Amino acid sequence: MIRWCFSFFLLAPWMLAHADPDLVTRLLRQDATPAHFDFCHGGGCVAVEALSLREADWDEVEALFSHVPDDADEERARIADAIGLLEFFVGRVTGTSNDVGGTFEGFGMPGQLDCIDESTNTTNYLKMLRNRGLLRFHEVGDTHTRGYFLNGWPHTAASVREMGSKAVYIVDSWFYDNGEPAVILPLQRWQDGWKPDASAPALPPLSED
């Protein structure tokens, strides 16, 4: 089954009354750290919790970068794993550990996130990595949206920009279940409608080559 994403509030119009674009913007602008960050869930970031990571959990994230990546490709692989690990740790305390990849399969289930939730949280996880000096080859980018009902359902994801080449890579944590590595691939390939095969395991980060 192909998993398409559009925010829960597009599936359920009554949720529009609870979705606040200004809130999402504020969440995306926060300077997240392991000691303090806001986590959103419920579809369209209708629920927000102020959280902090346990030191032991953050130590596991930092351990992924204990050997300094040799290049941007290797760093993207570490980023993908770090996003999955952060999702796992946060899921244990927020009740989102059962989040199913995609929107439709888990729609209406407790703890399910849509792509607005995922892209917002992933952006803030990326800021944590940056703020702790773990990103040497990338900057945290803006969220990007594809689809707009013209060539597919709207879908939003986080991004990073490679410092050397200035190439933008999507960091998409929505396709797979909670705790799985994020998909990282070039912006244009993602905008062209890339999606994983429904039966395939999570892919390693893809480069421009």
Features from the language model and the residues they span:
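Mid-length scaffold segments of soluble, non-membrane domains
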Residues: R78-H138
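Bacterial N-terminal signal peptides that target proteins for export
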Residues: M1-F6
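Acidic/histidine-rich, surface-exposed loop or edge segments in extracytoplasmic proteins
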Residues: C40-D73, T96-G108
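Post-signal/leader-peptide non-cytosolic segments of secretory proteins
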Residues: L27-Q30, L51-A56, A63, I170-D177, ...
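Low-complexity, Gly/Ser/Thr/Pro-rich intrinsically disordered linker/tail segments
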Residues: Q191-D209
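Short N-terminal segments immediately surrounding and downstream of signal-peptide cleavage
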Residues: D20-G43
